[in-house]
Amino acid sequence: MCPPRGLLLVAILVLLNHLDHLSLARNLPTATPGPGMFQCLNHSQNLLRTVSNTLQKARQTLEFYSCTSEEIDHEDITKDKSSTVAACLPLELAPNESCLASREISFITNGSCLTPGKASSMMTLCLSSIYEDLKMYQVEFKAMNAKLLIDPQRQIFLDENMLTAIDKLMQALNFNSETVPQKPSLEGLDFYKTKVKLCILLHAFRIRAVTINRMMGYLNAS
């Protein structure tokens, strides 16, 4: 029987905040880190920096749009679509590997983050889940930025450095990653709602970027 998603989330958050860095690294699903993993760690660190900078700019520019973490309605666009928190759990918290492997996520095996032939299925699932998260946010951000670019006020746009950081980490996780251009839908276009949605997504994505960066750090140290 698979443990409830809520319990898994609480467990991983407790571990991330209270367990020793190297101790946790030793207990994660094992893999052999190589130069590619170090490169992926650099990409994840750059992603965290750029999304933090983008969020800070949005909070300043959209100060009248309720853009602080205390004011927004938090939303996770990856809910029920990916399993990053569960897939990247330490082994002792995920004794039933089949519970995770049964998730409908395509395994990636052609990225540079793992040494070919030396990654466990759970480690591959962890990185595959991270890739799926990035892909979902990439689609949302690019569609949103396309709308912001036609805003007559031209008040705010997404930082290209953040979009590039997403692309680079996705490519490191999957060599076949492709960027799909997004065209804005003009039906029911509301720039105010778009900017509020931007704040919500940036806050959620920064939290996910923190998780991704920690996971990459643990994998690189293991």
From Swiss-Prot:
GO CC annotations on file: interleukin-12 complex
InterPro entries per the UniProt record, alphabetical: 4_helix_cytokine-like_core, IL-12, IL-12_alpha
One Pfam short name: IL12
S-S pairs: 40-113, 67-199, 88-126
Principal localisation: secreted
Secretion signal span: 1-25
Alphabetized GO MF terms: cytokine activity; growth factor activity; interleukin-12 receptor binding
Disulfide bond in keyword set: yes
Subcellular location as annotated: Secreted
Glycosylation sites per record: 42, 96, 110
Lyase keyword on record: no
Keywords: Cytokine, Disulfide bond, Glycoprotein, Growth factor, Secreted, Signal
Transmembrane regions listed in the UniProt entry: none
Subunit structure, as described in the record: Heterodimer with IL12B; disulfide-linked. This heterodimer is known as interleukin IL-12. Heterodimer with EBI3/IL27B; not disulfide-linked. This heterodimer is known as interleukin IL-35. Interacts with NBR1; this interaction promotes IL-12 secretion.
Function: Heterodimerizes with IL12B to form the IL-12 cytokine or with EBI3/IL27B to form the IL-35 cytokine. IL-12 is primarily produced by professional antigen-presenting cells (APCs) such as B-cells and dendritic cells (DCs) as well as macrophages and granulocytes and regulates T-cell and natural killer-cell responses, induces the production of interferon-gamma (IFN-gamma), favors the differentiation of T-helper 1 (Th1) cells and is an important link between innate resistance and adaptive immunity.
Name of the protein this chain belongs to: Interleukin-12 subunit alpha
Gene: IL12A
